[in-house]
Design a protein with these regions (language model features):
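Short, charged phosphate-coordinating catalytic segments
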Residues: 1-32, 138
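Short, basic (Lys/Arg/His-rich) helix/loop patches that form interaction surfaces
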Residues: 4, 53, 69-79, 83-142, ...
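ATP/adenylate-binding site constellation spanning eukaryotic-like Ser/Thr protein kinases
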Residues: 16, 60, 124, 146, ...
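C-terminal secondary-structure termini that scaffold catalytic or DNA-interacting sites
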Residues: 23, 31-59, 64-65, 69-74, ...
Length: 180
């Protein structure tokens, strides 16, 4: 989630037939949501959300490991296996309820002794890290699958105080030298 900037529903709605580990691409076109008490796989938020997403090696390796884990779960579950075709499932192959994922995420954070944050904060963190790495805003917009650049820059990006300090220092130096 953090590396790809996925929304919780996009992660939980990702199916194996939308992941190409050989070419290293995931096609994010669906999301899993609870609607009127029922889990439903629905199209993503916007057309720009459906863009193919290149998978960094760390993600491809994690997904390959997930396939192995799923195969073990399928064997252990036996006839109780309810294969949904989704990448992330319960030990019986059923979709993971978004609320349960939130609880699991928070429990893992607490166990790792890191600050417990909302799942969606990983998406904002992804955007902020892309900014800190000087990734062009249009590239960040594509990674986060936003339809408007303003959403990427205004809502998700947080400029660090160190970045602000450095920018003002550079500006001050330029003005002090009479360059501008």
């Amino acid at each position: 989630m953090l590396i790809l900037g996925l929304r919780r529903g996009e992660l939980l709605g990702l199916a194996w037939d939308e992941v190409d580990l050989e070419s290293g691409v995931a096609h994010i076109a669906w999301q899993l949501q609870r609607i009127k008490g029922e889990l439903q796989r629905r199209p993503t938020k916007t057309a720009s959300s459906e863009a193919p997403l290149p998978l960094p090696d760390i993600c491809s390796r994690a997904l390959a490991q997930r396939k192995v884990t799923e195969a073990r779960s399928r064997l252990a579950a036996g006839e109780a296996w309810m294969g949904s075709g989704l990448v992330f499932t319960t030990r019986f192959g059923t979709p993971i309820d978004p609320r349960n994922f939130q609880r699991f995420f928070q429990a893992r954070a607490a166990k790792a002794d890191v600050p417990v944050i909302p799942v969606h904060a990983t998406r904002r963190t992804c955007a902020s890290l892309l900014v800190a790495l000087d990734v062009h805003p249009r590239v960040a917009m594509t990674i986060l699958r936003h339809s408007q650049i303003a959403v990427t820059m205004d809502i998700y990006s947080q400029v660090s105080s160190a970045s602000t300090k450095e920018a003002l220092k550079l500006l001050g130096n330029q003005l002090g030298e009479g360059v501008l």
